Amino acid sequence: MSLLARRALIRALFLILLPATSVAGTRPTHEYDLKAAFMFHFAQFVEWPPEALPDRNTPLTIGILGEDPFGKTLDDIVANEAVRGHRLLVRRFQNVDQVDSCHILFISPSESRHLESILSHLDRRSVLTVGDTKDFAQRSGIIGFVITQKRLRLAVNLAAANAARLRISSKLLRQSEIVGPLRVQE
């Protein structure tokens, strides 16, 4: 494991073991540095069905749909890294039709107005959807980054994870808020 990846993992582990991470007074760049570390961390604490990663030659792909808020940070963290024998690969997409080979997909805030159609396109596919738009997990995304009281927290939609046939580690779930879908008021 490279020094940069090790530092990112240590930072992510430290942050995940705290009840919440303070982002008070941080620049957006720093916020997305933390989120990039979490994205790497998610790859280690989620299990995909065998057909999603059929052999060791299949890379575990982290995708970014829409505008990229991470810059080079995510690429630097996963460079020369592997999870369960699968090398990590970062790809950027402008269209949801391109993301079929992704295992983790960060849906950028730039795509928020298309979120329902994006999630519908990915329905029942083994893609860990991650985002930071308002109510992301409640709107059927799997992991949402939430800032509450100036702290970075995770919201996890277990029903969406189960539909995607993804198994999320209890270690990650213990540090997350478990949420369900938003109910439409009539």
Kindly give the residue locations of the regions a language model identified.
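Short hydrophobic alpha-helices and adjacent helix-cap/hinge residues
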Residues: 2-186
